[in-house]
A protein has these predicted regions:
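PRPP-associated nucleotide enzymes
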Residues: 2-132
């Protein structure tokens, strides 16, 4: 998958993992973190990798949680597909001198459910099946 491809390219890198998912309550969406593990991040180059960048809230919430393991020298956010709204949100959250954003494509909109249009669908569900 996306993460394993990065681990093949950056084969000497340490790796962490976060289990994050969206919780929908009517029109409100929040991000739930169930699990996070990683080595110390102090003064390292940190790549936060996810196939989709929709609202940007998963990236922000995950990064804030990772900071409990130290402060990286540089942050790279990597996504295959992003939305214009998600990119704008991350620009508000992070100063440009602290983060580099890498996206293969930026789609123009989010629909009323905050899914990227046209996007890829729910990557987590497509890769692993529906949440239990």
């Amino acid at each position: 998958l996306f993460r394993s491809g990065f681990m093949q390219v950056f084969d000497n890198a340490d790796a962490g993992f976060v289990a994050a998912y969206r919780v929908e309550d009517g029109n409100d969406i929040s991000i739930q973190l169930d699990y996070l593990a990683c080595p110390s991040l102090d003064n390292c180059t940190f790549m936060l990798v996810d196939p989709m960048l929709a609202t940007g809230k998963s990236f922000e919430t995950s990064y804030r949680a990772y900071l409990n393991n130290g402060t990286p020298a540089k942050l790279h956010i990597v996504a295959v597909v992003a939305s214009e709204q998600g990119v704008a949100y991350l620009k508000e959250c992070f100063p440009s001198d602290e983060v580099t954003l890498w996206c293969a494509v930026i789609d123009p909109e989010l629909n009323r459910l905050s899914y990227i249009v046209p996007g890829l669908g729910d990557c987590g569900d497509l890769c692993y099946g529906e949440k239990l």
